[in-house]
């Protein structure tokens, strides 16, 4: 905490009062440093460790400014995961309750039409994952973003990576230019991505970097167990039974392994829920709700659960499989020992993980302690854990778990690759045009625009086909002929037909 009070940050009276009512005793270090600068109208690049109050650092000043002149879409907040978007939306609603703030969460897994209707009402705050918001914009939904005052990238190091490059670029096209908006970048880790800001174009930003961002809190006990890889399951069962009743998150590296571990634990009477990207949104929210409520004490998850999620009572974090990134370790263990509470993080180390542990110890500037185990007790669970795991994996293979999701992900990656190639081609041609004639302004080649549109509108693989309609010259008569042909064939340019139009044609 800082020595300042919320009153000293220049906030309105109602906001200070509500912060106190919500239990914010004093601003955290990142809040005390960034809120005044945001109120001055400056762009921000800020990083601080997990649990430092980053969300409130941008939510409070945005609501402060919104209360002075409420209108349309005032702020767009982008975040990499659905769960984090929901959580940010909840914080905006809580802090902005006295002014009846209208905050909409726009994420995948929710009905598109329902979201479009909500966005059409111009909420004050839009909290979104890039893919879903870009999809709405690219599909022609007219969201009034031209007067948006704030663009926030939470977990900016992730959002500025290649995974979200095209979606972010698409969203930026619909926002005001950098000089007419404030851009705020927040992250738990400062990476090279945050220094490569050509696409965001910040205006002399205020940069705040918490010197302790890689430090883990003193109340967190960090330990390791060295083991052969095939014995991980029996060690996991041993630890969870030993700490029965404690709330624990088990981090695994892929969706299939998450389901396998969760299924194994449930078969061994250790109630567990899972969280990963292959689950639909309803299942993800249900799993989080069940875990947060304490009905189930074990959450098995991928790194979807490692960033930003505020689950105050997590007592143990288990790294069943270490991430290849040392900084991901910091995000994971940051799920426990929050807000002054104690916690412990236990990492499973195989002979292949020794170099990873050295990298982690170097970045956190402390050595992990050995977690003492009773090996006789551990190996009593070996047979039952192994048997349960095999049964679950056979079932997952029978239902072809994740096959369709992987296919869709492969298609999406291929589409992104094609779009990137088209964009690079466009940039190359524009650069050549500039070199040939410096007096000409940069223009986008029409054929490239058509090519991008064609790629974006490619239908997913389907067994149905549509009849092609021969293009006629663009005269009034030919347009009429085209229209009659389309009605007759019950077909339209994009190969699809709306229910409204279909009904209209049928009635004729």
From Swiss-Prot:
Key words, A-Z: ATP-binding, Helicase, Hydrolase, Nucleotide-binding
Reactions catalysed according to its record: ATP + H2O = ADP + phosphate + H(+)
GO cellular component, as recorded: nucleus
Residues given in the record as ATP binding sites: 48-55
Presence of keyword Nucleotide-binding: yes
Pfam families: DEAD, Helicase_C
Residue spans of biased composition, Low complexity class: 430-441
Compositionally biased tracts (Basic and acidic residues): 444-454
SUPFAM superfamilies: P-loop containing nucleoside triphosphate hydrolases
InterPro entries: DEAD/DEAH_box_helicase_dom, DEAD_box_RNA_helicase, Helicase_ATP-bd, Helicase_C-like, P-loop_NTPase, RNA-helicase_DEAD-box_CS, RNA_helicase_DEAD_Q_motif
Alphabetized CDD domains for the sequence: DEADc_DDX49, SF2_C_DEAD
Record bears the keyword Glycoprotein: no
Domain Helicase C-terminal: 219-379
Coiled-coil positions: none
Gene Ontology molecular-function annotations: ATP binding; ATP hydrolysis activity; nucleic acid binding; RNA helicase activity
Entry EC no(s): 3.6.4.13
Position of sequence motif DEAD box: 154-157
Short motif (Q motif): ranges: 4-32
GO terms for biological process, alphabetical: rRNA processing
Span of domain Helicase ATP-binding: 35-208
Region spans: Disordered: 422-476
Role played: Probable ATP-binding RNA helicase.
Family, per entry: Belongs to the DEAD box helicase family. DDX49/DBP8 subfamily.
Domain commentary: The Q motif is unique to and characteristic of the DEAD box family of RNA helicases and controls ATP binding and hydrolysis.
Protein's UniProt name: Probable ATP-dependent RNA helicase ddx49
